[in-house]
């Protein structure tokens, strides 16, 4: 929502449009006494009294995982209003947010949500099909025939060919790479003009086979093997490019996907594990768009492969192995973006930059000014960009994506939440999140051993406090930091080299209120609204002790229980 929609006013001169928020009474307020960089979270509607004068940040939030949608579209997820304010002589600062148009899903985002729903719908059929296969006692001869059939030099594949309809086309493809883990095929109709040679396609097979596939399997677990060939198919086909030809959005296209229906044994199933990829030399994103370039696909295909492979593994571990439901979409996507980061970290290790640029000159970097090496460009920058955009316009987005409507910005914050969680709990937690019957917030709670509301609040505090300017070593608890990444330094660098995409050095930077909005001794009040699973950020300085602050709905005294409303207070240095 537009920041201009906030109503900020002194109650001494309030109009009928300004919120009136009573100071919490001593019997209902939680007394907060914090030293510098201390953090405390209290339930919403409780009210707080800050014992000490000083500078504070407060983060009102809805840590909800409940489905609030009133229909089948992203626009039906409502925002919920809140009021925050109190009595004190204060000077306040308010976090900047950019207006966004309703956080609608793009055609590509809708397609990926559809794929996750196909997995949900096909799960019972896939479980039945897997049981049928397990009941058949294979002979050495039948296994050998399966392996031989899977490695035909030319074979047909059925490919989902519509963003919205259950339509498939059959393509004929040639085998260009047969490896330990991967069989890579190329559609015989793929363009040769502006396209890859078979030698270049085979190099993808080697990269997927030796670099990327082992990472996902080691971290998350094994894929299924319903065709008993011991390998995963990769198919490069222009059918993927053409999925978005009617969307008319150049630059927005399907780079690749995994279709869970392939494992269900239905009429359109290929009855095997397959990753589908777009190809260069063919338009994508709309009928008037340029063909995808070689460099675009070189950057996108590896990251898309390791992302979709996590979905494939998750489907096997949740549905086929444990006969449970598919993972909640927000967490499933967050884990796949974690897979992207893991792929990127492999290439970072090959071309290290011990400190931020300038980096050591190497064949792995086109410029010493790059934060990430060339081979990591498709893996890492998109995640940092998506998270940045979430925080810059956070009121219209949700970490937990009620109803599973996940925008690219929401995927960004899901990745960052898991990045923080793994920093706190250890790398092995990624495997625990996948190899389980649990899903969603309950899965996170079981793995972390804590409530989701506590984790959510402390994650938000970490996004504010990580490498906070002026903090000395050990002054900020590890709980409120990202130990694997220096977020502020990375975003500061991105702001320097890509100002249009990163207009501020950090998305949670704040600006002073205009002079007319400076809070007086009488009171302050702010009215806003946010999605379930979102938060806001305010900062202010109090010159007296025992400042009261309330966080409540505009009508009544308490929020809906399912919103999990809570208020995180952070003491900042003066």
Model region roles, listed by residue range:
Residues 1-7:
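Sec-dependent signal peptide recognition
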Residues 11-13:
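C-terminal motif of bacterial Sec signal peptides marking the signal peptidase cleavage site
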Residues 15-199, 203-207, 211, 215-219, ...:
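Zymogen propeptides/activation segments of proteases
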Residues 18-45, 49, 67, 439-574:
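Beta/coil-rich, acidic/histidine-enriched accessory regions frequently appended to metallopeptidases
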Residues 180-328, 335, 339, 343-349, ...:
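Juxtacatalytic substrate-recognition/specificity segment
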Residues 308-318, 336, 410-430:
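Alpha-helical scaffold elements that line and support the substrate/ligand-binding pocket
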Residues 324-414, 441-467, 471:
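Acidic/His/Gly-enriched intrinsically disordered linker/tail segments
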Residues 342-350, 421-431, 439:
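Secondary-structure boundary elements
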């Amino acid at each position: 929502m537009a920041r201009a929609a906030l109503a900020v006013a002194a109650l001494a001169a309030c109009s009928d449009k300004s919120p009136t928020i009573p100071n919490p009474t001593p019997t209902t307020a939680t007394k907060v006494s914090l030293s510098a960089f201390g953090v405390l979270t209290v339930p919403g509607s409780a009210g707080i009294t800050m014992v000490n004068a000083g500078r504070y940040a407060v983060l009102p939030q809805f840590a909800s995982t409940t489905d609030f949608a009133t229909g089948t579209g992203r626009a039906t997820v409502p925002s919920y209003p809140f009021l925050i304010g109190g009595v004190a002589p204060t000077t306040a600062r308010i976090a900047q947010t950019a207006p966004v148009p309703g956080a609608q899903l793009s055609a590509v985002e809708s397609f990926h949500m559809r794929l996750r729903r196909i997995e949900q719908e096909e799960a019972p059929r896939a479980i039945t099909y897997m049981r049928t296969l397990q009941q058949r006692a294979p002979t050495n001869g039948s296994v050998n025939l399966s392996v031989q059939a899977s490695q035909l030099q030319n074979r047909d594949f059925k490919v989902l060919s519509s963003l919205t309809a259950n339509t498939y086309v059959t393509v004929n493809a040639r085998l260009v790479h047969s490896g330990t883990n991967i069989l890579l095929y190329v559609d015989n109709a793929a363009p040769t003009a502006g396209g890859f040679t078979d030698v270049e396609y085979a190099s993808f097979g080697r990269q997927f086979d030796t670099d990327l596939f082992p990472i996902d399997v080691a971290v998350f677990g094994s894929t299924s093997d319903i065709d008993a060939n011991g390998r995963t198919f990769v198919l490069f086909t222009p059918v993927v490019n053409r999925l978005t030809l009617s969307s008319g959005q150049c630059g927005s296209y399907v780079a690749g996907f995994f279709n869970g229906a392939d494992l269900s044994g239905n009429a359109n199933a290929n009855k095997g594990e397959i990753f589908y990829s777009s190809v260069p030399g063919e338009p994508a994103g709309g009928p008037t768009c340029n063909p995808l370039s070689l460099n675009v696909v070189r950057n996108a295909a590896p990251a898309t492969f390791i992302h979709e492979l996590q979905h494939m593994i998750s489907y096997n571990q949740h549905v086929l192995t444990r006969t449970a439901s598919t993972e909640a979409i927000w967490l499933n996507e967050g884990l796949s973006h974690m897979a992207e980061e893991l792929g990127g970290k492999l290439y970072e290790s090959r071309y290290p930059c011990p400190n931020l640029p300038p980096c050591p000159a190497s064949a792995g970097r086109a410029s010493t000014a790059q934060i990430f090496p060339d081979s990591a460009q498709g893996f890492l920058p998109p995640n940092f960009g998506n998270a940045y955009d979430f925080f810059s316009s956070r009121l219209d987005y949700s970490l937990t994506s009620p109803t599973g409507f996940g925008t690219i910005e929401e995927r960004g914050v899901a990745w960052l939440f898991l990045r923080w969680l793994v920093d706190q709990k250890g790398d092995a937690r990624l495997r625990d999140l996948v190899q389980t019957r649990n899903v969603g917030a309950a899965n996170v709670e079981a793995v972390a051993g804590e409530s989701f509301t506590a984790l959510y609040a402390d994650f938000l505090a970490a996004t504010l406090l990580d490498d906070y300017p002026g903090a000395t070593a050990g002054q900020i608890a590890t709980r409120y930091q990202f130990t694997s990444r220096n977020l502020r330094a990375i975003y500061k660098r991105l702001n320097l080299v890509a100002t249009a995409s990163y207009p501020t050095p950090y998305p949670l930077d704040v600006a002073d209120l205009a002079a007319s909005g400076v809070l007086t001794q009488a009171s302050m009040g702010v009215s806003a609204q946010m999605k379930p699973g979102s938060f806001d950020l305010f900062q202010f300085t109090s010159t007296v002790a025992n400042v009261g602050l309330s966080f409540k709905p505009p009508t009544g005294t308490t929020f809906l229980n399912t919103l999990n409303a809570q208020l995180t207070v952070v003491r900042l240095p003066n």
